[in-house]
Amino acid sequence: MSPATLQDDPSVDSFFNVVETETLALFEHLSFEFLEEFDVFAPAETGRTRDHEPPELMRGFLHCYYKDIYGIRPVERELRNTVVWLSCGFDRPPSRDAVDRFLTDLEHVVNKVFDHLVEQAALRGLLDLTYCIDSTDVRAMPADQDASKCYDPTDDEYYHGYGCTIVSTGQKIPIAAEFTESKQAPEETAMRVTRDALAVAKPIWMVGDSAYDTLDWHDHLLAAGVVPVAPYNARNTDDPKDIEYRVEDRIEQHSEDVQLKQSTLDETYNRRTGVERTNESVKDCGLGRTHARGRVHARAQVFLALCLRLVVAITNYERGDNPGSPIITV
């Protein structure tokens, strides 16, 4: 049963008029029925009906993350609230086993759920022509034995957890991401996430910090018709070039007719703060610290946080509010 169906029922019409909430607003413009198409949520081959309600449970988790409620038990407790489980479309509160199993199974397809929401954001024109890429830390619970000791070069400290590489655009809109073992991800990760971002739509600029000063990354983007802007890291060579950005050198290898002004590159690179704001916004949605014991649930939580950020942006856009706002006003 969908929230819309519930609101059409005269017996609860007055109820929802009284409790108009951010939860109802979150699900007003997006349908999650597409989750039922994934095989992972299908009944077991033995014929036993699995206690799965994918659209309702997805709405339930998004509600909880929006309210800063994480972890299987806290989520299950929150979904016992009559206002909440009715708002999410349940006929009755889900069991703890159902909540746990949904998160476990969701991990298999959560990146596809994220991709679906990215498409919805793109259809609404929420992307712009500058993409920014960056990695961020994902702190884990001490009891998470799958997490490892990671180094955060930004804060010059070690932490227990994982990492996430994100490409964002527009008003704090994540469009591609990969869950990683640590914040310092290998070059292959940057290449995969970059390809995923370009598959959504082609920008004019792709901005990264000096960690993305690699030939393969620059050449791949230039070949795709995108201008990469990352500071030249002179420490990568014994014979440093007299340039500020790697693209100043690589552009000559790809085109003799293209020239880039230093001021234009500087102005474009300054937009990199956009991905930092996106990272902070997604951390507010639950990415910053996982409340999971194990990599599977940790990865699911990270992508749920990314999904929530997209849902909030789309909801605000549809309601005529600022898509970049982290909250929904009702």
From Swiss-Prot:
Belongs to the transposase 11 family. GO terms for biological process: DNA transposition. Coiled coil: none annotated. This is Probable transposase for insertion sequence element ISH11. Involved in the transposition of the insertion sequence ISH11. InterPro entries: Transposase_11. Keywords: DNA recombination, DNA-binding, Plasmid, Transposable element, Transposition.
